Amino acid sequence: MKVTLYSDGSSRGNPGPGGYGTILRYVDPKGNVHEREFSGGEKETTNNRMELMGVIEGLRALKEKCAVELFSDSQYIVNALNNGWLRDWKRRGWKRRDGELKNAELWQELDGLLAKHAVTAHWVKGHADNEYNNRCDALATAERDKYTT
């Protein structure tokens, strides 16, 4: 099955309150479009952590092997997948060349999920004209704002 996954993460402060929003879309054999939204947040987190959580939650929801087109405005995630960073971190025992890999447990989980699917990652400009990225941003912002007073 072909699936499109859009995801965005947000934090106010880094660290600070944050949220993520994710949309999964697929077209069934009859041509019907199906969408599912996911969102969540944490009181004290970082933007990168929320970006990762959004992608992970979307992939966790897939119950069978899928061809996934991932769209994210996080260059960190897209570059990690497309430029071999994830592979290199794994090879080094989940460390960066210069030391600690932040959110290593999330990168490990993402790596396991990626092994179950054929994922192609694409960068999209945030806060621009991509309808689904903007919807994910709104979901992430709403979750983040639950933790701000």
Regions from the language model: what does each represent?
Residues 10-17, 55-135, 139, 144:
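RNase H catalytic domain
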